[in-house]
Amino acid sequence: MPELDLELEQIINFRQYPIDNEVFIEQCATELDKKGVLTLPNFINNETLLELTIEAKENQFKAYYAKSTHNIYLTEIDTKLPPDHIFNYQVISSKGCITTDQIPENSKLKSIYGSIIFKDFLARVVNERKLYEYTDPFSSINIHYAKENQELGWHFDNSNFA
């Protein structure tokens, strides 16, 4: 494993979640395999969480808001199926979003996303040889905003894991 990044050590609760520890990584992978989900409460320390919350609020004015409908598979309506078929059932997404290029360069979100140790941890937990950064300059990191009566409609993600 790479040497621990001091900035990452100040972002993540390493005492509780030693993401560079072989035994911990194996425990996480086992839990994900058994339960289909891995939950790490308080993974990001409180100070960082507060900082990220303030940062998100300060940048909310940059958000693009949109309302759309989609099915749970995020695919087009299948005209071969009846309109009331579950595949064609439409849910609503009405939210705001800022994209990677709108997130401050010094954001700890970018530090986490770019961390080799964090990527190695995730790769091992999800049983991938290596994870790569998403090269889309807008979609690698997003902050979603939902005001009252706005929502992100339920859907299956397009990626293997989220």
What do these predicted ranges mean?
Residues 126, 142-157:
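Conserved short histidine dyad/triad with adjacent acidic residue
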Residues 38-44:
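Short amphipathic
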Residues 28, 36, 51-53:
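A structural signal for short hydrophobic/aromatic patches embedded in well-ordered alpha helices
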Residues 66-94:
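Charged, glycine/proline-rich intrinsically disordered loops and linkers
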Residues 44-47, 51-61, 83-136:
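Signature of the catalytic double-stranded beta-helix
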Residues 162:
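Catalytic core of Fe(II)/2-oxoglutarate
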